[in-house]
A protein has these predicted regions:
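N-terminal membrane topogenesis motif
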Residues: 1-22, 74-77, 202-218, 323, ...
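Signature of the first transmembrane helix
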Residues: 2-60, 95, 102, 154, ...
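Interhelical loop/hinge segments that connect adjacent transmembrane helices in multipass membrane
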Residues: 3, 167-174, 183-226, 265, ...
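Helix-loop junctions and terminal segments of transmembrane helices
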Residues: 26, 55-71, 248, 252-290, ...
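Interfacial segments at transmembrane-helix termini and the short loops linking adjacent helices
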Residues: 102-118, 304-335
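Membrane-interface junctions at transmembrane-helix termini in multi-pass inner-membrane proteins
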Residues: 112, 122-144, 332-363
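Hydrophobic alpha-helical transmembrane segments
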Residues: 112, 116-119, 143-191, 211, ...
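Membrane-proximal transmembrane or re-entrant/amphipathic helices at the cytosolic face
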Residues: 431-480
Length: 480
């Protein structure tokens, strides 16, 4: 299947994943209140750290490996089973950690059943093998499965979560929506994997340990400046501030997910091109990908800054007004994470230069931790937002500098300059509308509509390659 079709399918998957919390959060936040939302998020973050350890970088490492050998049925069978068994063994260790935390940490003992329920994420992640379907580029199945599971989860949420005491139901549905579909992944593997096409005694689980460990090191460092702010807010301040911060993070991640949808599709393709030494095609694809990232992330970042009050009130309610500044402070990470994610986890990783990504993220993690220590005690969730934005900026800058020898980003190409021009224009437009109408519903609606029209018009005027391709695609569809 082509990259365009895979991108559209994955974009549908990502958008449905973003739509689910955007629909549910306004409903649940008004019922469970900031302290209830904050407690679940606090526990989910801790479980997320454990899941990160038990996964050991497998979700990314395995995609690259499956993409390389997907045409070799025997080797594909063997590697898939080896990675599944390795992940399962590590998950058992993860549950030992869960038991230790339950018996020793007072903040977790506040609600042991809730924490135990959320730990189901570990089991479903181990059996899911999502990496296999990404490696063979079966994004059609991934998208359909996700839509079905999320729809059922949405229905269940409105049926079972009606009072503040329904926190347990909310947590269960959250787990179902996130990883419940992995059960289908596991049983569907029989369609692709012949479990009798190799000798079990020939399996070598540990050959995957070291390369996956490299990705784990990278993931754990990334997780530090992605999740540490939430954990530090919970321990240093309180769950209410975690709830405020979580509201801004959820909307920011939702917007960021739109930009990152392309990256999931491109990792197996980059890996295949690099493995076959098709470097000219590799560079051309990388150039297009970076330009797409810049062209989409810039207007989304600007829109997030101007529309933060409306978005917070719309999706979270007036009780979450303290989330507005945090969301605006964090808006630059849309651009920073989009660039570093594509450059590091797709381009450089496919080239085998993951050490550059590790060095960059170490610097960002250290900066994030130090800034959190200084800023959170005095500024709470605003300080956490500042720390995260600065850390992501440093990661991106260091990665660009260290990776320049292997791939250089042409920030001032004709195509990218068009995006800067168009973004500057919509900033002026939004400032004018804000002065004319004030910060209200009319500004929100007109601001979005007029910004989209003006931005696309400028790109069309400058003959942007993506807009021209979209126009051609639409014309072909209409005339068929």
């Amino acid at each position: 299947m082509s990259i365009k079709k895979n991108f559209i399918l994955n974009l549908i998957n990502v958008l449905s994943g973003l739509l689910f919390p955007l629909i549910t959060f306004p409903y649940t936040s008004r019922i469970l209140m900031p302290d209830g939302i904050g407690l679940v998020q606090f526990f989910q973050t801790i479980i997320g750290y454990i899941a990160l350890c038990t996964a050991l970088g497998i979700p990314i490492y395995a995609v690259r490996e499956i993409a390389r050998i997907k045409d070799n049925q025997i080797e594909c069978n063997k590697i898939t089973v080896e990675i599944l068994l390795l992940h399962s063994c590590l998950t058992l260790i993860g549950y030992v950690i869960v038991v230790v935390l339950i018996t020793t940490v007072a903040k977790i003992q506040v609600d042991i059943p809730l924490f135990s329920l959320l730990s189901a994420n570990l089991f479903f992640s181990a059996i899911g093998a999502l990496w296999f379907y990404q490696g063979i580029e079966d994004f059609k199945y991934i998208t359909i499965r996700a839509l079905v599971v999320r729809t059922l989860s949405l229905i269940a949420l409105f049926i079972f979560v009606k009072e503040k005491t329904d926190l347990f139901y909310y947590a269960a549905i959250s787990v179902l929506a996130e990883v419940g579909g992995n059960i289908f992944n596991f049983f569907r593997l029989r369609k692709f994997i012949n479990f009798h096409n190799f000798r079990w005694r020939d399996l070598d689980l540990m050959r995957h340990f070291r390369p996956a460990l490299k990705i784990f090191m990278l993931n754990i460092i990334i997780s530090i400046y992605v999740n540490l702010d939430t954990v530090m807010l919970g321990f240093i301040r309180n769950e209410t501030l975690v709830g405020y911060y979580d509201a801004s993070v959820r909307i920011t991640k939702a917007i960021l997910g739109i930009v990152q949808a392309l990256g999931t599709v491109l990792l197996p393709r980059f890996a295949s091109l690099a493995n076959n030494n098709q470097m000219q095609e590799f560079k051309a694809l990388a150039d297009k990908s970076i330009s797409f990232i810049i062209g989409t992330s810039l207007p989304l970042m600007v829109g997030m800054i101007f529309m933060a009050p409306s978005l917070i009130f719309l999706f979270c309610g007036p009780l979450f007004a303290p989330s507005i500044w945090a969301m605006q402070i964090m808006s630059p990470i849309i651009l920073f994470i989009a660039i570093s994610g594509m450059l590091g986890m797709r381009i450089l990783y496919a080239l085998g230069k993951e050490n550059i990504v590790i060095y960059s993220t170490v610097i960002g993690a250290v900066i994030n931790f130090l800034l959190n220590c200084f800023l959170i005690p005095s500024y709470g969730h605003y300080g956490a937002g500042i720390a995260t934005s600065i850390a992501e900026f440093m990661v991106t800058i260091v990665m660009i500098i260290l990776g320049w020898k292997y791939y250089s980003i042409h920030f001032f190409s004709k195509q990218n300059v068009t995006y800067y021009l168009a973004t500057g224009t919509i900033i002026l437009l939004l400032l004018f509308l804000l002065a004319l109408f004030g910060d209200g519903n009319l500004f929100f609606i007109l601001g979005i509509l007029m910004s989209v029209i003006v931005y696309i018009s400028i790109l069309y005027w400058r003959k942007d390659v993506f807009i021209i391709q979209m126009k051609t695609l639409l014309i072909n569809k209409i005339w068929k």
